[in-house]
Structures are given as C-alpha cells and as structure tokens.
C-alpha cells in the first residue's frame, strides 16, 4: 500500500466555498501541499449578499487579512445582530445579537427579566446591542477604535483556537455582511498570489480507481487532473461526493419545508436610507424575506416553500416588499437542497459548502458551515495511511454542526406566534426532532443553558436559544422558581447598567453610514 503523505489537493468548484478552502489550506500548509482549483467559466454560483457569524473574523485573522484590506473590495458592512420582524405579530421585532448573556447571582439575566423585567423588550433590557441596532450605530468609532477596547488589543482572547474552542470564552461584538462573489474574487487573487493553481475549465467526468477512490477528474481543455485529496465545492449538484461516489443525501424537509428562494440585488441610496447594522428577517405569508445591507445596495430574497407559494407569487411579493427600486432588477430563482450528505468525507473526497449540506439561510449559517468544515479538514488532514478515525472524526463534527443548527432553526418556526396563514399554522404541527421536543419541555420551566441545549458544538451558545424563545413568543416560559425567593436588587442594578451603557454608546458612536463614509468608501 502506498503510504506517501497526501500532498496534492484538487478543489473542484470555485465560489465562496472553493476559494475559502483554497486560501485556508494554502495558508495552513504552505508549499508542503499543492492546491489546484478547477472551476467552470460558465456554471454560475448560488452566492448572493451574505451574512455571517462573528466567528468569521477568525478566518480572516488566520489569513493575516485586516478589515481595511478585504472589506472595501467586498462591499462589506458590519453586522451586530439578526433582526426578526413580524415573527410574533405585525409590527413587532426583536434582535438576536452578538453579545454574551450576563448573569446575576447564578441566573442568566433573562430569568430575572421573566421574573420582573423593566420593560416588555427583553432584547433591549438584557443586551446593549439591541439599542445600537435600533439606532443604526457602527461598532467602531471614527478613529477606528472598537466599542469594546479589549478586542482591539486581543489581550483578553486566547489565540490559535478553532471556533469550537473559542465558544464560551469570548463573544466578539460583530460579524459582517459582504458580496459573496466579490469575496470569492478577492480570495482568488490572495490564493493565486500564494501558489494556488487556478484552472478554468469544465469537469466532464470523475474517474475512480479499483478501490472506488477518485484518481482524477477529466476536463474539457486541460485533460486529466489528478490528486491525492479531492474537495467537492460543486454546490447543490454534489458532482464528486453525491454523484461519483454515491453518498446519499439526508433531507431535512420533514422539519424545515422551505425549499426555494428568489433573490434580488438592489442598488440604493444608502446616504438617504442608512446602513442598518443588522440582517433583517421579515416573516411573510409563505416564508420570510432577508435584507442584507451592503455598500451601495442591499441583497434581498424571499425564502419560501413551493407547496405554499409559486415562484411567480414569491417574486411579486419580494418586489412589492422592496419597492420601486426593484422594478428593473433581474431576479435569481434558486432551488435549495435542505439537509446534509450522509458523509461529508468518503474515501479521498471531502465535500465543503452546499455539496456537504445546507439548512436554509435563516441565521446566516452558510458561510459558518464552510469555515467550520475547512477548520475541521485541517485538524483531521490525513497521513499516508488515511486512518479511518480521521474521516470519522471529521464526519461526526460536520454532521453535529448541521444537525444542531437544524434544531435551532426548527425552534424559530415552532416558536413563532405568527399564525395567520396556512404556512404559519402548519409550522406548529410539523415534525419536531425528538430530542428538541424534550428540550423545549424543559426550557418552559428552565431557560437554556450549556447543559440542556444540543450537546455538540454547532456554533450557537445558550443565549441564542434564549433570544429566539423570548422573541418569537409562542412557547410559554417562566423564570426559575428560586427567583421568587431571591433579592432582585443586583438584577435591577444590572438592567440599569445595560440601559446606561446603551445610552452612552448610542450618543457617542457614529452611524454605519457615517463610519464607512469617513473611511473613504463610496457608499
């Protein structure tokens, strides 16, 4: 048996997944591993305006990229939270922010809020970020300093950790919005400058050896391209993993019915409209609409289930929602494959991106899945014996992340008090994963903590579950009975401190538009 260490990686497919993978692997392994990326010049990518988790900054830090280098090239803006609009009732909104939950006397502040909150806005009472979002503030001052100074110096943060190792230690206060195609273009230049070979060609066939492993891909103009490890970044088609290697796809459609989207890229006068520091998810009759603010435009799209809405109806609803600015903008209709591959790594093929899995755009998990998979590939990169435990570890980590996010998204629909259409009525009777159903019963009397959420790393800390449970409004919750016997004075002091801190930051921070205009960007 050939025990030579694998040192030739072939990535099939470009887009965000392909170029994030290429740039990360090249930075991780340098000249010790050759990386070739093959992408068609004719097959389009799904990428639209993208929103992210705050952990994405670790990706850019790993590549030694500073914000001023990549953000202007990608029309990027800051994201402090997701704003959920009309999920509980028309006109109601709440935020799921990037901000750790405070605790008082051993109980999360949300418990104290349920016991005796100062207002009916849990997000503004328990998080500073909600007020900054309502006021449209940037997380940075005009001199570039961050609202939380310790992160500028990185003195309080452990270095060199993966996302799963960071969770619970710190919470960076923002993520990003950016144009996916522009990020792919930027990372393409970064990767090629560092030795990644770029082949623009169509893959005609995937050839297997007598073991069933991929030996090479056959291209139209460049002939055979061989390698040791092949990375499938071919999107929903899954050309290598699903088609050539026959790995089955595990659908999540029984619990998450949205299977379609229509997207628009709409130029807007951001000086007049401002640049909100959040992703907006607005509930509609048969799904929800995302709004992602970028430099000079918004990315927006209607995510829906075709059993409840036709593509024509969805496009009309989206255009009416955006207004006259969308009149001449071309629509991009997308069929989504919701679920994950049974294995994301089989033999010598690893799927990353949509070929691995996708759990609809709600909560901005697409880029997170890519980033997590790349980190795990480096962590489990094989030696010459291709030890099966490395594949098993990788597959377990990737599956756990997607299954955990699935539970979290199901909670959004099950928990939404909105009940005015057949779609929203059906969200209350649809299948629920057994473990989630058990957890919800516990959360009704004890809010989520690290011991009673999904037990494996999936990028979502307990406070995220608290925000959704409290914000969507359909699941009855009550505080810990112990609080009826506790002194509320310390909690009241904490609520006051949050309100005072929020007022100070709203008064002193610039708006997002003011910040990016001052940075010299053409907004």
Curated annotation (Swiss-Prot):
Entry-linked Pfam families: Trp_halogenase (PF04820)
Self-association state and partner proteins as the record states: Homodimer.
Full protein name: Tryptophan 6-halogenase SttH
Gene3D superfamilies with a match to the protein in the record: FAD/NAD(P)-binding domain
Catalytic activity: L-tryptophan + FADH2 + chloride + O2 = 6-chloro-L-tryptophan + FAD + 2 H2O; D-tryptophan + FADH2 + chloride + O2 = 6-chloro-D-tryptophan + FAD + 2 H2O
Residues binding L-tryptophan, per UniProt: 97, 456-457
Site (Important for activity): 363
Gene Ontology molecular functions: monooxygenase activity; nucleotide binding
